[in-house]
Amino acid sequence: MDSKYFPEACFVDSVVSAVLGMGIRRVIGNIIVETGDSPSRIPGSWPWEDVANYYGALYHSFNYRDNTYTLNMRSGKAGTPARLLSVVPSVPGVKFRNEVLSSVKNSNDAWIYGGPEAATLLIQGTIPANRSLFAVKGAMHRPEDCFLVEVEKRLKKAGVMVDKQEVEKGNNGRQLLLTMISPLLKDIVFYTNKNSVNLFAEALGYLISPTDYAKIVKEELNHIGIDSCGIILKDACGLSPANAVPAETFTDLLLWARESLGDAFLASLPQGGVDRGVRVYSDHPVLRGNVVAKTGSMFGVRALSGYLKNKKGETLAFTILVNNYEGDPVKVQEIMRDFLREIAEK
């Protein structure tokens, strides 16, 4: 709900408009988000330093604003403490301990630490010096709580009061307020690949199977003739370092996808010379516009899988996986780029 990737949905606005449209000016009782009895569980193999940051946002039964909040910060001279100005949207029940410093480095090296039950989250690291406003993004561990605060605030602003009284729960007298239509699956896949939205990947994994994702994926691969040996899947988004997929599996899947999925899948892949994610990998005239590929990265790991058009006009599927390297990650990316260039020029 209210994903930045689908701004036309405007869920909170629609709720407020529907309430006003029914002539409601007072809610006797409370607003309840029914999330079920099974809370989302963080995969045990996810790095602890990732779970409170935006790319560690879990898929929940109710999801709001990409399950992401923004810490708006202000920095001063290098070496001085940065100020936390605001948290948008509000994260009820959570306090932030800010230990972020201003730095000469022009990069976001601030991190949020803390689990889903933590009452206090720690912000450490650095942000660029002398910024009047700098955003650090975190993962909502309880998106329904953030939604409730926001919708109650918006209703109050519109003149609708919520009494917050305890009322007897039940299905009697329920009346449909509004219906929201999901974006198309191909559009969700588009942003999953183009923007590396881990939350969307986890949601798609849940759609495949809430409990047996890895098993179903292997069965489907075998069904379409792709060997699933050597595959270890601990999540759907790739945040777990315990995942393992052979390069051959990715490449075989790309060959199948080109024949079976059509243009929608191809359009979802970042394009060389256009999309920022593959900028380094396509930084050569023979590669610009001729590489479409999905990137993957974590500490000591760089991955690239997609399609390359060579000088002969042939389209080749490829996968490059570099694990546990030492040194400059940009240098590793440049080596991968040069490898692609050599193939493209043959």
Located regions from the model:
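Small-residue-rich helix-loop
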Residues: 160, 165, 195-198, 202-346
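Conserved serine DD-peptidase/penicillin-binding transpeptidase domain
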Residues: 1-228, 345-346
